[in-house]
Amino acid sequence: MAYLPKEHGAYGQVAFPLATAFGVSGVSTGGLLVSVAVIAGFLAHEPAAIVLGLRGSRAKRELGASATQWLSGCLAIAVAAGIAAVLDLDPAARRSLAIPAIPTVLLILAMIQGHEKSWYGEAAAALAFASVAVPVTMAAGSSMKVAFAVAIPFALLFTTTTLAVRIVILRVRGGGDPRATMATRRATLAISAVATAVIGAMTVTGWLPWSALFASVPGLITASIVAARPPAPARLRSLGWTLVAISTLTAVIVVATV
């Protein structure tokens, strides 16, 4: 369909944190309501891009009216489910909604400015999808510590691998951009190294369970390998399936150890 999101990797970024959160904490009414709001917001992305003119003037001219209807419907569902979730959640889980709300606002601002494909736009999307696991997990009665142990591995996986994939594209887009490629490579490797150190310290001090570190390792290693030795653009599809496998492994580790 014309209004379904075109970024196939984004489907996994939505599905894996939600499924893992339910696998760890169980299904709850509040968690389901948050999930409905998230999915509706996700489905609003493509029609919003058309309405904003991000898909070109022709798409806006030919599809603008129906895209506006689709967007309005998705936003109505998202708002209704969000309000119902706020009413259902306990105070702690209700406050945790601010965690995914912050990167979501940043993503919306990036879209309005036409920068959804920028590094910060894609990073905001990755963080928004991953951090939804926090309120969904807490909605079922789990602690903040457990909720972060679910969300952090996916936040690191999605953010670092998104940057790593950008390296592959930057090497060839428009004839290649060596400076941007090198900067993105350094950023990816630095984030991976710092994240490993910080999570390790937080587990030692008891702020996070050891499972958070174990579950984060596959994604950080994968991002570092891709950043250091990026594959040819022709292998992007294979890389995509590799990231699906790593996401699955991360989910299994989280469910088995948290």
Regions found by a protein language model. Give the residues of each.
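N-terminal topogenic module of multi-pass integral membrane proteins
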Residues: 1-90, 246
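Interhelical loop and helix-boundary elements at the membrane-water interface
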Residues: 1-11, 59-68, 107-127, 174-189, ...
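Core segments of transmembrane alpha-helices
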Residues: 12-18, 74-80, 125-132, 185-200, ...
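A mid-sequence, solvent-exposed acidic-amphipathic segment
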Residues: 161-205
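Intramembrane alpha-helical segments
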Residues: 79-84, 92, 96-136
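Transmembrane helix-loop-helix
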Residues: 33, 69-105, 190-230
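Hydrophobic, aromatic-enriched interface-forming segments
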Residues: 122-172
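Helix-coil boundary and interhelical linker segments in multi-pass alpha-helical membrane proteins
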Residues: 19-35, 82-97, 131-151, 198-212, ...
